[in-house]
Every structure is written in structure tokens, then in C-alpha cells.
Amino acid sequence: MPTRIVPALACAGLALICGSRAKADPDFGYVYTADIEEPDETELTLWATHRAGKGEGHYDAQDYRIEVERGLTDRFQVSGYANFAGHHVRGLSGEFEPVHRDLAFQGLSAEFKYQLRSPEKRRLGIALYAEPGWSRISKVTGEHATEYEFELKAIVQKNFDNDRLVWAANLTLEPEWEREHEEIGPGTKSRETEKELGVELSTGLSYRVAPRFWLGAEARYHSVYPDWTHGLRRENYAVSAGPSLHYDGGEWAVTATFLPQLFGGPGRAGSSLELDDHEKTELRVKISHEF
């Protein structure tokens, strides 16, 4: 187990014994549901994601997010994020330079989520989501770069078997503008801005196997379109899927999802995986507390 994510898992173990009352619906590691925080309720969430494996050399990265979520009305909630990152990169070719950084402030983002229809009473739940963000460290390479993004998400959710089985799916569009701080000559730095569009389809299914425990699976398709304002040309894609576990203790909740990449393209010689913009495996743990 990656040592850098052990503290998050230790906190998760502590959270397992702190709860009091269970909620109706589960949380997923990557897939969003159409549920909305109740008015005047606040939730604090720690996200910890470990990404590893590029097919050569050594690559491991950690993404940490501290989220404060607040319900404003019966249908609208807002969140603020402080993002941190760690990268350990060596022996990779292409755009990857050696990076050894345990933890650094990465950037800020905000979330706005509006529920069009609740998933209660066996209806199809629908929600819309927007997340503007700013980053000072590239998520993939770990190098310093100024990035602006605007994530847009359509969310659907359907509950079955008296809410014991929950299905959710997301369509995500994420335009991004990046300016790398690259030195191209003595005292001269590149100021070129690159545009990129990420397109993602994700889905999750979770079943309540005990009063507080949910067991399920998640799947994700993610693709990248460079210079998207001049036409859509897919540069690469990756498909990942894996198990998801959620524990709801009332005020405390813990979610863990493991997503290995199944296949992608274009793959490198002798591999069916896309390892330029994606990794071999991802492990995410989320710890939430309501107050």
C-alpha cells in the first residue's frame, strides 16, 4: 500500500467507529449523484487520490482536496476546495522531467450544483454541476504551470429496490487553458497557452449490503482533445473500472474506490494502456463529516 496515502486510510478507520445514523444513498469515489446538501447544513470532506504507473521509470502522484460544502436551498448547494499535490517522477521520457515533491499547494476551485429533480419516490434524479478552477501545478507532469479550467457536468441518478440499489451516471466536459513556465533560452520563458478539452463518461452502481455499508463498482471513460476550439480531434483515451466501498456512519462517512486502467489508446509498444495523460491505477479515499 502506498505509504503516502496511509494517513488518510488511518483517518478512515477512525471514522468507521464514530457514526450514529445512516443516510439513504451512498457516495462514490468518482461518480457524482443528484443528491443535494440540505439547506443550512455543511459538510467537510478530505479527498486523497493516489495515481501510479506510466509503463517506464517511476511515477506516483498524490492529489489532496479539502472541500467545504454548504446547502443553500432545497435544490442548490455550493462548495469551495483547497487543492494540494505531490509528485515523484523519474526515468520517464517525453514531456516528463524529474520531480520530487511530497506536498505543495496546487490551487483553488469552487463548485455549484443545482438539482433539477430529486431521485426520491423512484424518480430519475437530475442535477447540473459547474466547477471553475485555478491551478499552479500540472496534475500530470507535476511541473509548475498556470492552468484554468471550467468543469461542466450533467448528473442522473436512479434508485431501485426501496433505495437499496443506486445507479448514477455523469457526462463531463472540462475545457482547460494551460500556460507552462518553460525556459526556452537564457532568461527567456515560454508564455504559450495550450487549450485542451477533457470529455468523460462515468457510471456507478452501489448496493446496500448492510445498514451502513454499500458495495459497488464504478467505470470511467476519459478522453483528451487538444486545441479544441479549432476542431475536435481525439488525442487519447482511457477506460478504467473497479470496486467501490462506502460506509455511512451518520455524521461521518468514508468512501474508497480503486480504478485500474483496463485499456486505452494510443497504447505504447506491447501495451494496451494509454500512459501519457493517464496512469495504470488510481486509488481514492474520501472522508466526510457533517455539521
Segments from the language model and where they lie:
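Bacterial N-terminal signal peptides that target proteins for export
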Residues: 1-9
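Low-complexity, intrinsically disordered short peptide segments enriched in small/polar/basic residues
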Residues: 2-3, 14, 69
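Cleavable N-terminal signal peptides
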Residues: 11-12, 22
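Local alpha-helix boundary/kink/capping signal
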Residues: 13-16, 249
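Transmembrane beta-barrel domains of Gram-negative outer membranes and organellar outer membranes
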Residues: 23-290
